Amino acid sequence: LTCLSAFLLTTTALAQKTYAIITGVSNYEGTANDLTQSTKDAKSLASLYKSKGATVVLLTSQNATRANVIAAIRKVRNIATSNDRIVFSYSGHGMENIICTYASTSSQMLSYNELFRELDQCPAKDIVCYIDACYSGTAANNMHSKNFVSANEKAWKNIMKSNPRYIVYLSSRSSETSSESPLVGSGLMTNGIMKGLRGKADSDGDKNITAIELFKYIHKDVQLHNKRQHSQLVTSKALYNNVLMSW
């Protein structure tokens, strides 16, 4: 009995927890730049992760400010362990090197540099990011090594060797816009993520969705709707078979 109790305690201690920070902005200040799907996308993804037992922080529209996003990451940082998974998701407008969190000027928005600097400090086993925004490929210029070295002049392979925890899905190349579609009812990449994690990406039928399975599904699905949008996966090959979700 004592040995069994010790085994159960050890198993519980080692169980990986998932902490998800899900953000989406449809309604910006004024009405000229509003979107139709981003807030809904964030809520749908948050619901999916909650159904799988994740601890979720959901920030949408006026609550999805730069300050609130950073505060949420820091809160998770204080409770996550080196065995846990952190998920960060953003749906909304994007500019070069910036995700358009709720603000009146770009200087008040969250840069990719800031985002990855905050995530770098989280003690997680792996960090999964979904960024569904125009020009999201520019995130490639803003990731860091463990010592927060700027990645502007480094190849992705060197970045991943330096900090091989990231599994990053970007909705488009650095020069491309990203689409949302009322007909699809979602941003195109987020639509692929939702369908993929719910089982569509399970190419080998083992009920587990791996990082590479999800990417292959997303890329193909987005291309069906928009040939000019190319989703990107940035990760180490060592993480290709990490299970993102079981269904």
PLM-predicted stretches and their roles:
Residues 11-247:
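Cysteine endopeptidase catalytic domains of the caspase/legumain-like
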